[in-house]
Amino acid sequence: MNKLFVSFLDCAANLQNLGYKLIRVAILIIFVWIGGLKFANYEANGIVKFVANSPFMSFMLKNASNKVTSPEGKVVKEYKLNEVKEGAYDPAKSAWHVENRTYTFSHGLGLLICAIGILVFLGMFNPYLGLAGEVLCIIMTFGTLSFLVTTPEAWVHASPEALAAGEYANGFPYLTGAGRLVIKDVAILAGAVVLLSQSAKAILARLGK
């Protein structure tokens, strides 16, 4: 049994290069798939809440951050009145998203995400391309993770009735579906840092450093 365990460890110890390749393939799949989905209106509609609340990106949308009064009499950002559930269609809300530049922004973001995924993958063959992709990937994941701070919808907000009933799922650390989607970028960030180190070492070796 001991020899079998040692053999397993010997095999596992030699998986580093395979691991690098798998991380590159994983980032390619995730980024190209998600980037491609940015050309679908339902996906574009879903990112508005993140962008509209970001101090770094909200200027890219025309109307999303405007304050309006909801039918309930609450002052909210305009995008809140134009949210469309996945699989649903509302022509008036779709027209608002066109006016808001939602789809234009989403298409540009999709192209950028796809390009980053491809560059990271190509780092398997060219460390300079990989380095560029990994730096961009790290910047993008930091931007995505910032949504946990800027997006109210990333956290559960229990109603007064729920709180009165003893419901404890309210605020930190209780992530909504949107927040759970964002937090996964921590793993992508870690993988990109590992690949950045690999690309940097390969470039230094080529330079004879």
Describe the function of each predicted region.
Residues M1-K209:
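Membrane-interface extramembranous regions
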